[in-house]
């Protein structure tokens, strides 16, 4: 009897988890773009070698109360066409996913994304969204007020946060476009491939810059702008990379 009950519970749990997963067919193409808006809580995103955007939600059941039978939920930002509190719109090669839940409620979403898509994320300060991304091979553009953590990415990157820390580890670097990483009151920690050829713009007002790259032999190429602002050509120079914070430190590390 005990074994039967356990099996029944496992079956029911599997059904619930399946019902909370939503797939968006797409292509694993660098021409494709995913836009995410208004997500709250932690937002982990993982790139993979597949063609579907897979969104899993572990948030509480969104089924309307019995009193709402025959009625549909109404949201100011769109229509829940997924069953997990999201509005999905497709235009050409761009897919836009908007979280419809109020900012007081964490969505508890996890995403798996085709690794070659570019990703754009916007999240207001009221949404307390900590974003973590790994294993993507295209452009990432994030505007938030909270923490950003990227691992095994190539860029280009355009990252902006107000009060969060930014942590980036590159696998390799796409130099087709310039990159920009900025925080107002957070620290920035970036690990670059050791042979990266880039023109760096480093800026901090009340913080400091720390690095294990050897600046001494080419110090003559470093231009001091004022305060702790510097322009520096690394490995002969290349694509433009702006890294700036107002009140935090900058850590620039050697990777593989």
Stretch-by-stretch model annotation:
Residues 1-24:
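Bacterial Sec-dependent N-terminal signal peptides
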Residues 20-126, 132-143, 158, 175, ...:
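Acidic (Asp/Glu) and glycine-rich low-complexity loops/linkers
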Residues 41-43, 170, 248:
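Extended lipid/amphipathic-ligand handling interfaces
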Residues 60, 129-131, 164, 186, ...:
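Hydrophobic lipid-interacting interfaces of membrane-associated proteins
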Residues 121-122, 128-131, 167-168, 189-191, ...:
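Beta-strand-rich extracellular passenger or scaffold domains
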Residues 153, 157-160, 169-182, 196:
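Short helix-loop boundary/capping segments
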Residues 156, 165, 182, 187-191, ...:
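Tandem repeat domain/solenoid detector
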